[in-house]
Amino acid sequence: MKKVTTLLSTLALATTLAAQNLPQTERQYLSGHGCDDMVEWDFFCTDGRNSGKWTKIGVPSCWELQGFGTYQYGITFYGKPFPKGVADEKGMYKYEFEVPEKFRGKQVNLVFEASMTDTEVKVNGRKVGSKHQGAFYRFSYNVTDFLKYGKKNLLEVTVAKESENASVNLAERRADYWNFGGIFRPVFLEVKPAVNLRHIAIDAKMDGTFRANCYTNISNDGMSIRTQILDKKGKKITETTVPVKAGGDWTSLQLNVSNPALWTAETPNLYKAQFSLLDKAGKVLHSETENFGFRTIEVRESDGLYINGVRINVRGVNRHSFRPESGRTLSKEKNIEDVLLMKGMNMNSVRLSHYPADPEFLEACDSLGLYVMDELGGWHGKYDTPTGVRLIEGMIERDVNHPSIIWWSNGNEKGWNTELDGEFHKYDPQKRPVIHPQGNFSGFETMHYRSYGESQNYMRLPEIFMPTEFLHGLYDGGHGAGLYDYWEMMRKHPRCIGGFLWVLADEGVKRVDMDGFIDNQGNFGADGIVGPHHEKEGSYYTIKQLWSPVQIMNTSIDKQFDGKFSVENRYDYLNLNTCRFLWKQVKFPLATDASNAAIQVLKEGEVQGSDVVAHSAGILDIKTNILPNADALFLTAIDPYGHELWRWTFPVNKLNQQTEQLSPLSSRPAYTETENELTVKANKRAFIFSKKDGQLKGVSVDNRKINFANGPRFIGARRADRSLDQFYNHDDEKAKEKDRTYSEFPDAAVFTKLDVKEDGGNLVVTANYKLGNLDKAQWTINPSGELALDYTYNFSGVVDLMGIRFDYPEDQVISKRWLGAGPYRVWQNRIHGTQYDVWENDYNDPIPGETFTYPEFKGYFGDVSWMNIQTKEGTISLTNETPDAYIGVYQPRDGRDRLLYTLPESGISVLNVIPPVRNKVNSTDLCGPSSQPKWVNGPQTGRVIFRFM
């Protein structure tokens, strides 16, 4: 056996060495590979910053990010091809490079991966070809006869930021994204043998059928093409050799692989195809290797999209190629980061909005597993037909062999030229579906930003519903807010296959002319699930939970839990037994424990997933019973590649809070009265109650004042006008202006009296009210100085925010620590994505769209057992004993433009109702059942325990 193993290893090594010695395509980079290794070229900018002089610039780059020219956001000049005032500087580049003598006699192409926008190229003073127009596409020139071999050569490039072609400007530059200028993707020499394989287009089906069209630059008598299929270990599986027809420019070949490992987003199995062009003596003239995957795409009318015979659900997002410091110029590492970011949210699809991405991004999608919609530019304007024909050919020739690409997109939102629809399949032997985003075409209805109710109507149409943009993000709105309702509707409907959220990340530019300020152009670029540097916002985790392919259906467990969970396997292909599950039984610290008290892990284990096939439900048995002293069970699902899908937390014991142990001689609470106040003292603490309104007016600990006061007060609010929904006020001309403003209900309660009585060792202070919302606030003060507040208020009607509140000066707050859902705040329509655990964060108050500190300190927090707020004056501790109540920590801040909400000040609050949040396009009530206001009728009660330290 050892001899066989050694022989196989030797043969594999020999094959590898032989492949290395084949005449293959070489690359000599003239620029860097991306933003991380730019190469300096000489540069002259004609206008704007640092213009009018020769200097240096890194290539590839967007010149604005290197300190040149003028920043320009595209939508400013929407619909105008040649407007006055548009930034239209040009950049002139020079670069000297050596070409080795060994390249003589070979074909040398000068390749630009992309340049914005019109690009003219000279080598050694001679123009090498026609001006290129179209910013996001690879283009090249055969410069074989322009070069000096073994000597230095001069490359000169002139790039115009604005195109001379009106259709290019309208398609690419009058759009809702940043316009840049420059050679923003790599430049290299592509060196091939004089007789070579020019291009290869592969079609590999799920049944193992492999077809390829091989294009050669020359077809001589006796030439042939040998094709070998290699598995992921480099082992040859099969091969074939076919003759090349003399005088033809392409050759078709076919072979078969038995039982191939199929490519899907869940199983991204890749193969290699090695193509060798042979002369009539069998000598290899040129060899090319392509990665590919076996998979079959099928669109079934009025049914769905099938990959390898399985109907898939699209869990997707739109993605720009972008970073704040480098604009559209990325690197291999940053492209992989983007794919991992999406996979981390359990997404399986991405739309390349609104242009083709870097090749490295597609390679990452191939190897890590994402379904891709590859898009021709055209935001609202469209390319003229000759330009579009040329760009489509280049786009598909570059991208055709990526198994991750499932759809081609002909522009965006009527930015499609219908004369181009037939061009895609001319170059794609796989005949992938062609999409019109926001349109109805090729069996797909892709309408954008429909409300929840409108989406239901679209699903009644015969076409497959797949919105290529939905739940438009803005600051903390959209994305995860409303996603639960949308997704439950979408995944269950027989004619909906999912869709693409807008958008992955904020497009905020780091302005080198504004001391590094991140410029999102107000609300235009602030649409991301994550911030410009991929700072994770609350919706990131909502999406991660809701789109997890493994769903635990239990909502709670108790002490009698037997270890069995109901589970749904929402994978399209994988069995649940390919996943692992880690569990822990834990004990949480109490509110009264030290601030650094940690969670105790009492017991932990791991189980393999049970045998539950894709698209089905079953039982997951983790084979453990709950320990008597356990507070909660953590359960984490791990996918076959070692990535966490989600962690569920199941509390089994809402904590019985311990009070300070006092000796029998401990002093009972005592009180004193004046005309206006009642002061209660217990355990070095003093509490002042007003006799005019019954509210707590002041707290001190050991004569140290804590300005927690003015409560409880009833707070209730609703959106001032329910514009665009069922409450729209047609008689109010300013109704639309009010649909984001929340107005408080005035509480007409009249204070009647303050009662004081002793109850055992405690003192009970009761404030009574009539004729309004607040009915009663009963304070029980025990000898340790704890206050238990039992309150009752009444409300009847529609409400978006409701509960009780207290005041505390925000500028005194340092941090908070709590046991509850976290670490992010929640909205009524974005409850998912948090986990019950101990969390803490320092005070922050980021301005949405401008500063990016997460999780936000302020907002509404769910399922809180206790919360300790550390201040400059001391600690305010709340233990919540009101079922289903939320703790409010001030009110969330909106962006400067107040496009989402203007919420009333709510201080420190205990809330029975919290507001939902809208998205950029749809008003709040249009986002689904979870976004509706609450109808409340009758008394509401609650209990909360306060400790001051």
Q: Where does each model-flagged region fall?
A:
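Extended carbohydrate-recognition surfaces in non-catalytic/accessory domains of CAZymes
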Residues: 20-111, 163-176, 180-183, 534-535, ...
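Substrate-binding/catalytic cleft of secreted carbohydrate-active enzymes
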Residues: 211, 339-342, 349-538, 542, ...
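Accessory beta-strand-rich segments of carbohydrate-active enzymes
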Residues: 22-23, 44-46, 88-197, 219-221, ...
